[in-house]
Design a protein with these regions (language model features):
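Alpha/beta-hydrolase fold catalytic core
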Residues: 112-157, 163-165, 169
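A general structural motif at alpha-helix termini
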Residues: 30-33, 41, 122, 186, ...
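Mobile gating loops/cap/lid regions near enzyme active sites that modulate substrate access
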Residues: 146-149, 153-267
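Sec/Tat-exported extracytoplasmic proteins
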Residues: 19, 33, 122, 126, ...
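Substrate-access "cap/lid" subdomains that shape
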Residues: 2-106, 133-157
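Active-site rim elements
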Residues: 2-3, 67-68, 129-142, 169, ...
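C-terminal, loop-rich substrate-recognition/catalytic regions characterized by aromatic stacking residues
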Residues: 76-122, 203, 244-267
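Alpha-helix N-cap/helix-start motif at coil-to-helix transitions, marked by capping-box chemistry
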Residues: 6, 109-116, 176, 180, ...
């Protein structure tokens, strides 16, 4: 989520207040001890908070507030994109932060002034035996996948080569949660518990690392033993699913409310 100028300024004001600084003393940030910076930002990162920091439209290098408009304009170099999400991204937060439901306070923390749109759609989820699965899907869609899909569609429309993926591997306690790709790409798995001990994870690691390495070197993801990875576009919506075995399927369109902006967090 790229923050608009107003949102970025609001978050900056929060940091300045925690740091005990005023606008006429902004230059003191340049000489602040790193310990003081960490102390000032700590309240902004406390608990389940995804948007305290991130890229911004600064009004200098990037004008306006519409990331998709910049992609449509194609003012920069035409580059290939490798994009994707994990199927159960927000299941990590269900377990780590005990996010088992949504209220106005949490919605505002995650989505800012977009919260009413999110709450309206959250209330449509049936509170039955399938609520956990549906809630994880809902939050994953609004926070992660919908933006990924919208960007992939826009970039492919603008002529960029787009390769889309989804990690479905769920043979572990938190399923295909946020950060679970680290065990395959970087041999790190600090958030992963009760992982399948069969040879399958090692095979998937070879597939994913091989495909990503090939993309870095040649601009096309591929690995020995994997199916051919077609480009994604709005009509031919092909997506590589990382599982055991890996396979290609059709990617669903965004499932968020049509009133939900691409920038999911704004103040």
């Amino acid at each position: 989520c790229i923050r608009d100028v107003h949102t970025a300024r609001c978050i900056t004001d929060q940091f300045m207040a925690h740091a005990g600084l005023t606008k006429d003393r902004t230059n003191e940030i340049l000489t602040m001890p790193w310990e003081a910076i960490l102390k000032a930002q700590a309240p902004m990162f406390r608990g389940f908070n995804l948007h305290a920091a991130g890229p911004v439209f600064d009004g200098i290098n990037f004008e306006g507030n519409d990331a998709l408009a910049l992609i449509r304009q194609q003012t920069g170099p035409r580059i290939s994109l490798l994009m994707g999400t994990n199927r159960d991204e927000t299941n990590l937060y269900w377990h780590i932060y005990h996010v088992h439901d949504m209220d106005e306070g949490l919605a505002e923390k995650l989505f800012g002034n977009r919260a009413p749109i999110v709450m309206k759609n959250y209330r449509k989820i049936p509170k039955d035996e399938n609520f956990h699965q549906r809630f994880v899907h809902f939050l994953t869609e609004y926070i992660y996948r919908a933006g990924d899909i919208d960007m992939a569609e826009t970039a492919s429309d603008a002529g960029q080569d787009v390769y889309l993926y989804r990690l479905d591997w769920d043979r572990q306690a938190y399923k295909a949660c946020h950060a679970s790709e680290t065990q395959f790409l970087m041999s790190m798995g600090s958030v992963i518990h009760a992982v399948d001990a069969s040879p399958a994870p090692e095979e998937l690691k070879e597939d994913k690392r091989g495909a990503f390495t090939a993309f870095i070197k040649k601009g096309m993801p591929a690995a020995e033993g994997m199916p051919s990875w077609p480009k994604f576009n709005r009509e031919n919506r092909r997506i590589m699913v990382f599982d055991h075995p890996c396979h290609v399927e059709r990617a669903a369109a965004s499932e968020t409310d049509l009133a939900m902006p691409f920038q999911v967090f704004a103040l």
